[in-house]
Regions:
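Phosphate- and other anionic-substrate recognition elements at nucleic-acid/protein interfaces
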Residues: 1-194
Length: 194
């Protein structure tokens, strides 16, 4: 692996109380490079508080190890289940708290549909389609869907890494329309490899 400049390291986070996916990439001179990925999986029999502590401590360790300058996290999608949305919100809040406690990490929040569209060209893509594209883009096998989602979040967020963003920035409609041509070209190159 080539030496990475610290300011090119990006973490994507797909929060969840059962599984929190994370993916680390760099985007140097518009070249995506896979660094690492994984899924934080608390014990199923643990209380919500214990699960949240487990997520917090493991995410803190990951951030300390890779020292990203940009953290990209998925926004909450409100589903029919209020309890699911609440638990997702708790996991997301813990992740944001850990990230916010670090110096020099900017935070970008992206909607799931935006990430799907940026990676696959369709805002309605399923997890397997995202996984397929991530493996093509990064040239790396990713066995867990939560990890491939997190890598997708990181890649979509890397599109805005050189723009001046405020912490907790929400991508606007005009930014959604202006998807980085380099990312589209990388997707097309990856599709041509298969």
């Amino acid at each position: 692996m080539t030496a990475l400049k610290e300011n090119n390291v990006i973490i994507g986070i797909d929060p969840g109380i059962r599984n929190t996916g994370w993916g680390i990439i760099s985007n140097f001179e518009n070249k995506l490079q896979h660094i690492d990925h994984g899924v934080i999986v608390p014990e199923t029999e643990d209380s919500d508080a214990s699960r949240l502590f487990f997520i917090s401590s493991h995410l803190d360790e990951i951030l300390n190890n890779y020292k990203p300058s940009l953290a990209v996290i998925e926004k909450i999608f409100v589903s029919a289940s209020g309890e699911s949305a609440l638990k997702l919100g708790m996991a997301r809040g813990v992740a944001l708290n850990v990230i916010a406690s670090k110096k020099n990490i900017r935070i970008v929040e992206l909607a799931a549909r935006f990430v799907k569209k940026a990676i696959t060209g369709s805002g309605a893509a399923d997890k397997n389609q995202i996984k397929f594209m991530i493996e093509k883009l990064l040239g790396k096998r990713v066995s867990k869907l939560d990890a491939s989602d997190a890598l997708a979040i990181a890649i979509a967020g890397s599109n805005s890494k050189n723009k001046k963003l405020n912490p907790y920035n929400v991508i606007t409609k005009s930014q959604k329309k202006n998807v980085n041509n380099n990312l589209i070209n990388a997707i097309n190159r990856a599709l041509n490899k298969s």
